[in-house]
Amino acid sequence: MYKQQYFISGKVQGVGFRFFTEQVANNMKLKGFVKNLNDGRVEIVAFFNTKEQIKKFENLLKNGNRYSNIENIEKKTLDEKYPFQFNNFKIYY
């Protein structure tokens, strides 16, 4: 299993980006979460089964939804000891 963390900056809050991310992740059967951060970015943690899933997810994130404007995506690989497990993908408020 591959565990990735993303920090997305740009016009990503108040434009349905979290809902878009949740839809993409659920369609791909990913597990994890998406949430707004106080600094205006969005954080995503996602668990993938294959590297191909990672590439597809990242390509969809780069485009965002029609109301968002993605300026930057920071990516971090989480190690196997990441303390949280997820049964699905959800939005944290």
Curated annotation (Swiss-Prot):
Residues 3-93 form the Acylphosphatase-like domain. It comes from the Bacteria. The keyword tRNA processing does not apply. The keyword tRNA-binding does not apply. Keywords: Hydrolase, Plasmid. The active site is at R18, N36. Its EC number is 3.6.1.7. SUPFAM superfamilies: Acylphosphatase/BLUF domain-like. One of its GO terms (molecular function) is acylphosphatase activity. InterPro entries: Acylphosphatase, Acylphosphatase-like_dom, Acylphosphatase-like_dom_sf, Acylphosphatase_CS. This is Acylphosphatase. It comes from Borreliella afzelii (strain PKo).
